[in-house]
Amino acid sequence: MRNLISWLFPFLLTAFICTAVGQSAPSSCKQCAEWNRPQKPFRIFGNTYYVGPRGLSSVLITSDAGHILIDGALPESAPLIIANIRELGFRIEDVKIIVNSHVHSDHAGGIAELRRLSGARILASKWTAAVMRQGGVGRDDPQYGSITGIAPIKKKVEELHDGETFKIGATSITAHLTPGHTPGGTSWTWKSCEGDVCHDIVYADSLSPISAEGFRFTNSRTYPEVLDDFEKSYKFLETTPCEILITPHPGMSNLWDRLEARQRGTMPDPMVDGGACRELAVKARAQLHQRIEEEQKK
């Protein structure tokens, strides 16, 4: 009996900690409960897995030498992400690198706890790293003053550069600065293979022109380069090799429709779409043009 308790103790302790985190750090947003609905984890392709809640992506990229985790969703999402990783047969303790798309509480809120339990390195753009260290919301973020900020991440946050590649075992992931939604937005690319078949996967950061009341994309004093940044990010989506698209909010890339089609046996694999990134750029650019037109009417 004593041996059984000793064996179970680490698992029980992790469950207790995760439950406490989920209960003590609720996020104050209307959509949070809906976003944080449980989602059964699944293989996207090769060594790439979806481990997030239903409405907020978190992606695990595995290797024999350790794993990479993209995004941590909400603070209260950490227990679900950890449980999903375990359900797939992996361990949070084997995550070696955690990276982020953009530093809003619905995509970075769970990173501090995931890092604490894994001991992983946290890698982020210079702007994102600064916000992670100080907590809150960056003052030049278009949504500053209208959204809940993140708690400061007390452990070291390493700064990355545009085009920098990070490798664990046979797995490599490359950072691409795609600002606009925030000044530090970052997209990620890598290859995953099943046998001799390999696909270019893109985790494309959000590019929606959402802002706090009073922010103007056409003449922002706090983020004057925002329109140029959006255009650079659209060009990235239009030109980068992209066969499987994932987005921080899975619905933006029709992930659930594609998964359901795959489960019905649709062929070729609905997850694979060589035009998805370009289509996302078209939609995002149209959203910005609409926002600009609305601002010019005022």
Regions picked out by a protein language model, each given a short descriptive name:
Residues 7-19:
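Bacterial N-terminal signal peptides
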Residues 1-6:
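Positively charged n-region of N-terminal signal peptides that target proteins for export
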Residues 48, 76-79, 86-165, 265, ...:
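Active-site HxH/HxHxD metal-binding segment of metal-dependent hydrolases
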Residues 47, 61, 71, 102, ...:
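Divalent metal-coordination and catalytic microenvironments
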Residues 271-298:
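C-terminal regulatory/interaction regions
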Residues 24-30, 37-38, 43-45, 67, 74-76, 94, 156, 165-168, ...:
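Metallo-beta-lactamase
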Residues 34-88, 92, 187-209:
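Conserved beta-strand hairpin/beta-sheet module of binuclear metal-dependent hydrolase folds
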